[in-house]
Structures are given as C-alpha cells and as structure tokens.
From Swiss-Prot:
Gene: pyrF
Protein name: Orotidine 5'-phosphate decarboxylase
Superkingdom: Bacteria
GO molecular function, one term: orotidine-5'-phosphate decarboxylase activity
Main function: Catalyzes the decarboxylation of orotidine 5'-monophosphate (OMP) to uridine 5'-monophosphate (UMP).
PROSITE patterns: OMPDECASE
Biological classification of the source: Bacteria, Pseudomonadati, Pseudomonadota, Gammaproteobacteria, Moraxellales
Length: 232
C-alpha cells in the first residue's frame, strides 16, 4: 500500500472496540498515518480488524510482541505477514535464534514485512528491571538487546526517544527506531514512564512515532493529527 510512506506517525488503536476503531479510522487519512493494532483489539476481533483497516487503505503495524520458542515465534510472524501487514514485532528477549528464524521465514516467503523487536517495555524503569533479576540497568539492557536484534537481521527496535541517539550510533542509521510514549506537552503521561514530544523524538533519531490517546481521545482526531504533523 505505501500510502503513508512520508509520515512517521502511527496511531495506536488501544483501549478501543472494533466499532470505535473503525469510526476513528474513517476520520483519518491513510496518506498521513499508519495504524497500530495491539493485543486487546486483535484478541477481540482477530484478522478481520486488519482486513477492515486494509480496505480503508491503511498500512497496519500488528503489535503482538510474539515471545515463544523459535519455531512458534517464526510461524506467528509468518502468519502475520500473510495478512498483508506493514510491520510486526517480537520480544528481543526471545533470543537470537527466534529472531533470526522469524526474519529468515519472511525472506524465504518473499515478504517485505518489517520485523522489529521490543527491547525493554517503555512502562519499565530501573527498579522494575531489578525486580526481574536484571541488575546492570535499563540502558545496558536496551543496548544489549538492540545489538542482538541487529545481529539477528531484524529491521529495528521499539525504543524510547531517550534511547534513540545511543541506538542510532550503536546500530546504524538504517536500523529503524519506533518510539511509543509520544505525548503532546499538555497530555498526561498515563502508563508510560519514558515519554517525549513528537519533534523531540524525531530530532533524537526516532523513525516512527506511536501516538495513541493524544489523537484517539481528541475531540477532532484528524485536526490533532494535522497539528502534530505541522509541528514536526
């Protein structure tokens, strides 16, 4: 589809029903943004929600964060690609073998679906990491998993804007950085610990910006999207 190729904005359809998601999609221009379908919406609606968004000419980021043994992870990624999605993700902590196999399955089947990895969830901080047994800090863990992702041949990682400069230097300019936790200055932080404004994120090296409530809960989502794009 490639309609939104010049826009860095991915609108997150989080905490929404199928009807609400499609109503929002009908207010947005597929030339100005892509859409993210996460676990809740996909679990409620299945592949039909992706098909409905494709019918509206949107490119879709399927945000299911697959994390399983290598073959299961790879087959799940392949199944996602068969839906015609633009991008899908896995957890980097699934390991090098799982990530590399998933990428190879895409290549073997001639899919150009972008495959990215999640390093550390943006809701987590150093204390949360320590509770899981990772004691050398957030920055070290993010860098380690980003390098593992690059080694596996994936296209990029999900990361906070604060990590973008470091990861671009570490993994190269072609390594895509997808940044959630994007808020406007007058928004609440909600459940994200590491947040940033759209312009700051792009300046710091992010390639794509995942924006949810700022747009989805706006009185006029289309106008808010235009405002964000004009600010970049």
């Amino acid at each position: 589809m490639n309609n939104a190729i010049n826009s860095p904005v991915i609108v997150a359809l989080d905490n929404m029903t199928k009807n609400a998601s499609l109503a929002l999609a009908d207010q947005l221009d597929p030339a100005l943004c892509r859409l993210k379908v996460g676990k809740e919406l996909y679990t409620r609606c299945g592949p039909e929600i992706v098909k409905a968004l494709h019918q509206r000419q949107f490119e879709v980021f399927l945000d299911l964060k697959f994390h399983d043994i290598p073959n299961t992870t790879a087959q799940a990624v392949l199944a996602a690609a068969e839906l015609g999605i633009w991008m899908v993700n896995v957890h980097a902590s699934a390991g090098l073998e799982a990530m590399a196999l998933a990428k190879q399955r895409l290549l073997d089947s001639d899919f150009d679906t972008l495959l990215i990895a999640v390093t550390v969830l943006t809701s987590m901080d150093n204390e949360a990491l320590m509770q899981t047994g990772i004691t050398d800090g957030l920055d070290a863990q993010v860098s380690r998993l980003a390098q593992l992702t690059k080694q596996a041949g994936l296209d990029g990682v999900v990361c906070s804007a604060q990590e973008a400069k470091t990861l671009k230097a570490l993994c190269g300019q072609d390594f895509k950085l997808i940044t959630p936790g994007i808020r406007l200055l007058d928004d609440n932080a909600d459940d994200q610990k590491r947040i940033c404004t759209p312009k700051q994120a792009l300046n710091d090296g992010s390639d794509y910006l995942v924006i949810g409530r700022s747009i989805t809960q706006a009185a006029d989502p289309a106008a808010k999207l235009q405002l964000i794009l004009q600010s970049l």
